[in-house]
Regions:
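C-terminal, non-catalytic "cap/extension" segments appended to globular domains
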Residues: 6, 10-12, 104-109, 130-142, ...
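Short pre-active-site segment immediately N-terminal to the catalytic Zn-binding motif
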Residues: 304-309, 360-380
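A well-structured
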Residues: 1-302, 554, 590-600
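Catalytic zinc-binding patch centered on the HExxH motif and its immediate surroundings
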Residues: 305-307, 340-361
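Post-HEXXH active-site segment of zinc metalloproteases
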Residues: 377, 389-412
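Long, K/E/R/D-enriched contiguous segments that form extended
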Residues: 280, 284-322, 328, 354, ...
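Post-HExxH zinc-binding segment in Zn-dependent metallohydrolases
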Residues: 403-431, 440-442, 446, 522
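Active-site-adjacent bridging/hinge elements
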Residues: 238-247, 289-292, 352-362, 382-393, ...
Length: 601
């Protein structure tokens, strides 16, 4: 590991960590008993429920600290048995804390509206109203307390265990990488992503083929995990009276069906915009279409040099500081305090994430840096998440529970600050400008084609899963069908990725369902916000910071309306954000012939 975790605990499994866990476990048990002893919320016992809520919030803060620490350790070394054992033990402790939430659901489920309204209006609950209203909404579709507790207990060794199995498989999985020069290397799966963004198409294809051969070797286990996770959710939905499997996803995203429909109405009306981006990519490669493994690939501009970690830090810091000094200052804090685990090594889990502790008010960023421009964007993306946590550091825990739709807005806003900051630097060459424009429009293709493929695949998968488990062959077939439908003729024959359902971690995250459309939502909302920044200048930044602070205080629609005055329930908002990709696309199209001879025809 090359990050500093000592502000969590001086060392793993040391006396400080043991005492922390013992006290947390004891306090959870005490609060669980206290909550279970109370009758449903009424005028006489309001102070008792207020005490439970206050103590539960404090426990949530402490649990976030321990969870963040353990997730850092397990992700950084997925082969360490002690870390994996601690991860499983933590899941058990979280399940016990979840039982307090079950009691809270019981407490507010049948409470008359006037008593509930009076209760949440108390001064001690200022800032927690949105959390409590959502709790009541969830309570109205909850099973009996006994069944909810049973579901929590079973989840530990059921749906969550399947998720942990996938994490274990992916962190230990390796693939054969055959380079164009004939050199062969055995690599951890965590390094595949960067190779799929390599400028050389032959390298990308080798990483794609080698990676999929590895995923094929574990296809049965991956399919079993995917079927079990979805099957559990569908069963619980049925017992809770959830009408449609997307209802829970919408609740978690804090948006209405109207808003999601507006987004996809605009997206499907403008599919030709991201398809044109891919056609330009295909033209630069001298092909008529692109394979799936080319989706996130950069255009192969000559003399592209690897970017060292020090160069990456400087690029992000300078761009952030120039456009948004507060963000640049925060990024320097990340670097100075060594909050980022970036080095490639065996045993690291694939992917990237940001995790925060509500107790220490710090964040950590996990990624694997392989000297590509895409990795620099990942650094900016995850730092956007970390900055969001920094802006909310003084917000009470109940108001820090915000949806992925708004979380992904903060991260992609960070990407835009980086790309536009570099584009506005007068010292960069035409080739460097072309690279940055390629990154900006290339991300448009990912968020407007790749992510919708995930969403449409998962919808179809859940529809079919109602009738029984899907075989490996059907999962592959369904993925290919979906990729063809969304990408259209820009996807070259045979260029599909039949194992995308296995290699994509997000399908196996058990805490959130449909972990895909929030990315498209965040990408487009961030473009809308960034357009406001360009128009209003630094006068917009206080509005943006208020947007970040209020992310857990209301629905996404209301937060956006309240802070920047936009109506995201209308397709027009999303259409305008999608069409904003036209300008960088045309700039790239004009610039390419100057830096890429093959693009002159």
């Amino acid at each position: 590991m090359n990050w500093d975790l000592t502000s969590y605990f001086p060392r793993f499994d040391g006396p400080e960590m043991r005492r922390f866990k013992e006290a947390l476990r004891r306090d959870i048990a005490s609060l669980k008993d206290r909550a279970a002893s109370l009758l449903p919320l009424n005028d006489e016992n309001a102070s008792g429920w207020e005490d439970v809520l206050t103590r539960n919030e404090a426990l949530t803060r402490r649990m976030s600290h321990l969870s963040s620490y353990v997730s850092c350790l397990a992700a950084s070394d997925g082969r360490n048995e002690d870390y994996l054992k601690e991860e499983a033990a933590l899941a058990s402790m979280r399940a016990e804390l979840a039982k307090v939430r079950v009691e809270l659901l019981r407490g507010v489920k049948e409470t008359p509206d006037e008593i509930f309204a009076s209760f949440i209006a108390q001064h001690s609950l200022d800032g927690a109203q949105n959390y409590l209203k959502r709790l009541r909404e969830e309570a109205r579709r909850a099973m009996s307390t006994e069944k909810e507790i049973l579901a929590t207990d079973l989840g530990l060794d059921g749906i969550q265990a399947w998720g942990r199995l996938y994490d274990k498989i992916s962190s230990r999985l390796e693939f054969d990488m055959l380079y164009p020069d004939g050199n062969r290397e055995r690599l951890p799966m965590s390094q595949r992503r960067s190779l799929l963004e390599h400028p050389d198409r032959r390298v990308r294809k080798a990483a794609f083929d080698g990676g999929n051969a590895a995923w094929q070797s574990v296809e049965d286990a991956a399919a079993a995990a995917l079927n079990a996770i979805a099957g559990t959710r569908l069963t619980l939905n049925r017992h809770r009276g959830v009408g449609h499997f997307l209802d829970l996803a919408l609740f978690q995203a804090a948006i209405s069906a109207k808003t999601l429909n507006a987004l996809f109405e605009a997206l499907f009306a403008h599919l030709e915009i991201p398809r044109r981006i891919l056609r330009l990519k295909a033209k630069s490669m001298g092909t008529n279409g692109v394979a799936w493994y080319n989706l996130g690939a950069p255009i192969d501009i000559p003399n592209r040099q690897p970017l060292s970690w020090d160069q990456a830090k400087d690029l992000v810091k300078n761009a952030f500081t120039r456009a948004y000094p507060t963000l640049g200052h925060f990024f320097q804090i990340e670097i100075d305090r060594n909050w980022i685990d970036w080095e490639p090594r065996a045993g690291k889990r694939p992917g990237a994430f940001c995790t925060s502790s509500m107790l220490s008010k710090e964040s950590r960023v996990f990624m694997t840096y392989n000297e590509t421009l895409g990795d620099v964007l990942t650094l900016a993306h995850e730092s956007g998440h970390a900055f969001h946590g920094y802006m909310m550091r003084e917000v009470r825990p109940y108001a820090r529970i915000y949806p992925m739709t708004l979380a992904e807005t903060a991260s992609t806003f960070g990407e835009l600050v980086l790309t536009h900051g570099l584009l506005e630097d007068p010292s960069i060459s035409d080739a460097q400008k072309a690279m940055m424009l390629d990154v900006e429009v290339g991300h448009g293709a990912i968020y407007l084609l790749d992510i919708p493929v995930r969403f449409e695949f998962e919808k179809s998968f859940y529809e079919e899963r109602k009738s029984g488990e899907l075989s490996v062959s059907r999962l592959k077939e369904l993925m290919i069908e979906t990729q063809r439908r969304i990408l259209g003729d820009v996807l070259e024959p045979g260029g599909e990725d039949p194992y995308f359902w296995a290699s994509k971690l997000h399908f196996y995250i058990t805490g959130l369902t449909f972990y895909n459309f929030p990315y498209t939502f965040g990408f487009l909302l961030s473009r809308g916000l960034f357009a406001m920044l360009k128009k209003e200048g630094k006068d917009f930044l206080p509005k943006y910071e208020e947007f970040l602070r209020l992310a857990g205080s209301d629905t996404a629609e209301n937060v956006v309306q309240r802070t920047v005055g936009s109506d995201i329930g209308k397709p027009e908002f999303w259409s305008e954000a999608i069409q904003s990709l036209e300008e960088p696309f045309l700039r790239l199209e004009e610039l390419l012939p100057k830096v890429l001879p093959s693009a002159q025809s």
